[in-house]
């Protein structure tokens, strides 16, 4: 057995590892600073300012969002994009990794880009991603293209972090402008007349490319139907090795839309004379996945690309972009970049420190109430009859118990802050279940494990356990991949019949790793 390593005598255990953190710029960029004389954004100035966590005047942010939206509004549902092009997957508010993406993929000034959606939510720099990408869209309207993801909607941004982020960093007006802009995003792209590019995937109601062109996209995505499927659907977990003959089955992971099968993809490709489908929507350990090849073309029938490295700071995954040029497909991977730290849910330091302060205050209150012994209380109450004296004693004891319970709550909050954050992240509302804190440390840990197991996540998880693998992180985060409950979630009778039929044939397969090839010709 090896001996434990001794502490490096040169490593200080009293000094801060990070001695100082630069304060974000207090100055907000004005329109004169952001836009040149021709009304085009100065993206280099914008990038430098946002990298320092700087902000813009609200009128400037609104101008970028609305001008970008007006360009998006003029584009078709299905874009036609020529090669060469660099295709990017989910970003999810990871602005500093987005900057790394442009280093790997090439400058937008001389590189054609196609983004497959999910620019916001989960990460804490979503508004920076929107402002920068929309500024690039204004500057390069014919070479930078943005598709809609399932998170570009009111329902998910209210449920997750984007709305709260907009209100903290700017205002609800900026959030509303973003929602209007998201309604303008195209739904799909036809790349080089060979590849259909979407965020999620296929729909049983979309058989031809014209079916996409006919959709009304200028609205909040519905809870079912072809527009929902384009944004939400996934390939079957055992894609290419299906145990079902159905082309589409109910998507039990998302709680909406469908899983589509290898035969469904091959039939769609053959019917529309296409080579492959490029999509995002699912985190990948390597940043990408290539699925089973088409028997007619020998090319992967489906490719998933994911461009948010170390997703949520826990997945430990690589990110990737796909460069297609001269009929050669090249995958470029990259790792995460350092980024400023935000407390969970944009919490401020005063809220964060409240448990520490509260614990000390309640300790003092308990000590004040306990200043008299039972004998002293009894001697002071000789003037009262027995019933009154007993009642007074019980009132005081109840006060002490109440303060003691409050002290235990603050103590649990202080000692188990990581467990509290874990449990908050695993509950759909982001709130702790009632009575968890007052039950003490054991109740908190039990509730955390129950919350995880309720969503079929990894069993035996402990809040103190450090997540070490991609699959473990993906399992724990599974609850957040579902569509949150909404009022219009009930489909029409016709759609209900098809869903019931799909449910009857549902399977639970085990995924196999796709090809790890980085070049395809």
Swiss-Prot record:
Residues covered by region (Interaction with PxIxIF motif in substrate): 327-336
Cofactor: binding comment: Binds 1 Fe(3+) ion per subunit. Binds 1 zinc ion per subunit.
SMART domains hit by this protein: PP2Ac
Entry keyword set: Acetylation, Calmodulin-binding, Cell membrane, Cell projection, Cytoplasm, Hydrolase, Iron, Membrane, Metal-binding, Nitration, Phosphoprotein, Protein phosphatase, Synapse, Zinc
Positions where N-acetylserine occurs in the chain: 2
Cofactor(s) listed: Fe(3+); Zn(2+)
Region listing for Disordered, in residue ranges: 475-521
One Pfam family this sequence matches: Metallophos
Modified residues (3'-nitrotyrosine): 224
Record PTM Phosphoserine, positions in chain: 469, 492
Membrane-spanning parts: none
Region of interest called Calmodulin-binding, as start-end residue ranges on this chain: 392-406
Activity regulation description: Activated by Ca(2+)-bound calmodulin following an increase in intracellular Ca(2+). At low Ca(2+) concentrations, the catalytic subunit (also known as calcineurin A) is inactive and is bound to the regulatory subunit (also known as calcineurin B) in which only two high-affinity binding sites are occupied by Ca(2+).
This enzyme's EC code(s): 3.1.3.16
Region feature Catalytic, mapped onto this chain: 56-340
Principal place of residence: cytoplasm
Catalytic reaction annotation: O-phospho-L-seryl-[protein] + H2O = L-seryl-[protein] + phosphate; O-phospho-L-threonyl-[protein] + H2O = L-threonyl-[protein] + phosphate
Keyword Hydrolase attributed: yes
Tissue: Expressed in neonatal cardiomyocytes (at protein level). Expressed in hippocampal presynaptic termini (at protein level).
Keyword Ion transport: no
Matching SUPFAM superfamilies: Metallo-dependent phosphatases
UniProt binding sites for Zn(2+): 118, 150, 199, 281
Free-text note on domains in this protein's UniProt record: The autoinhibitory domain prevents access to the catalytic site. The autoinhibitory segment prevents access to the substrate binding site.
Similarity comment text for this entry: Belongs to the PPP phosphatase family. PP-2B subfamily.
Stated name of the protein: Protein phosphatase 3 catalytic subunit alpha
Gene label: Ppp3ca
């Amino acid at each position: 057995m090896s001996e434990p390593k001794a502490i490096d005598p040169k490593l200080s255990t009293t000094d801060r590892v990070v001695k100082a953190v630069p304060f974000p710029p207090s100055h907000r960029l004005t329109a004169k600073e952001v836009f040149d004389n021709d009304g085009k954004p100065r993206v280099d100035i914008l990038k430098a300012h946002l990298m320092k966590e700087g902000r813009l005047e609200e009128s400037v942010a609104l101008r970028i969002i609305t001008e970008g939206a007006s360009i998006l509004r003029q584009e078709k549902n299905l874009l036609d994009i020529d090669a060469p092009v660099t295709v990017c997957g989910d970003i999810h508010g990871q602005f500093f990794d987005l900057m790394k993406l442009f280093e790997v993929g090439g400058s937008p000034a001389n590189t054609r880009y196609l983004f497959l959606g999910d620019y916001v939510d989960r990460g804490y720099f979503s508004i920076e991603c929107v402002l920068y990408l929309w500024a690039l869209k204004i500057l390069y309207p014919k070479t930078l293209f943005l598709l809609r993801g399932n998170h570009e909607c009111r329902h998910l941004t209210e449920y997750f972090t984007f709305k709260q982020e907009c209100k903290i960093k700017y205002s609800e007006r900026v959030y509303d402008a973003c929602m209007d802009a998201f309604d303008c995003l195209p739904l799909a792209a036809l790349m080089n007349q060979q590849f259909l590019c979407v965020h999620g995937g296929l729909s049983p109601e979309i058989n031809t490319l014209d079916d996409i062109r006919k959709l009304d996209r200028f609205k909040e995505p519905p809870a079912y139907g072809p527009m929902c499927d384009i944004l939400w659907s996934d390939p079957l977990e055992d894609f290419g090795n299906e145990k079902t003959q159905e082309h589409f089955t109910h998507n039990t992971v998302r709680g909406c839309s469908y899983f589509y099968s290898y035969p469904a993809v091959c039939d769609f490709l053959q019917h529309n004379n296409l080579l492959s489908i490029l999509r995002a929507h699912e985190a990948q350990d390597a940043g990408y996945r290539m699925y089973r090849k088409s028997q007619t073309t020998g090319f992967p029938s489906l490719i998933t690309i994911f461009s948010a490295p170390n997703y949520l700071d826990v997945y430990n995954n690589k990110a990737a972009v796909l460069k297609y040029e001269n009929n050669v497909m090249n995958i470029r991977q990259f790792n995460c970049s350092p980024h400023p730290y935000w407390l969970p849910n944009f919490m401020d330091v005063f809220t964060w420190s409240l448990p520490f302060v509260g614990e000390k205050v309640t300790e003092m209150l308990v000590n004040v109430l306990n200043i008299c012994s039972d004998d002293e209380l009894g001697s002071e109450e000789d003037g009262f009859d027995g019933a009154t004296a007993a009642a007074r004693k019980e009132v005081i004891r109840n006060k002490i118990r109440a303060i003691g319970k409050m002290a235990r709550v603050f103590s649990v909050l202080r000692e188990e802050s990581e467990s509290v954050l874990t449990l908050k992240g695993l509950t759909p509302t982001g709130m702790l279940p009632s009575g968890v804190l007052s039950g003490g440390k054991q109740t908190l840990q039990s509730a955390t494990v129950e919350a995880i197991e309720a969503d079929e996540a990894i069993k035996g998880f402990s809040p103190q356990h450090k997540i070490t693998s991609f699959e473990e992180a993906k399992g724990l985060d599974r609850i957040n991949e579902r569509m949150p409950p909404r009022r219009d979630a009930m489909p029409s009778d016709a759609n209900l019949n098809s869903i019931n039929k799909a449910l009857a044939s549902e399977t639970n397969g085990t995924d196999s790793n796709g090809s790890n090839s980085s070049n395809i010709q």
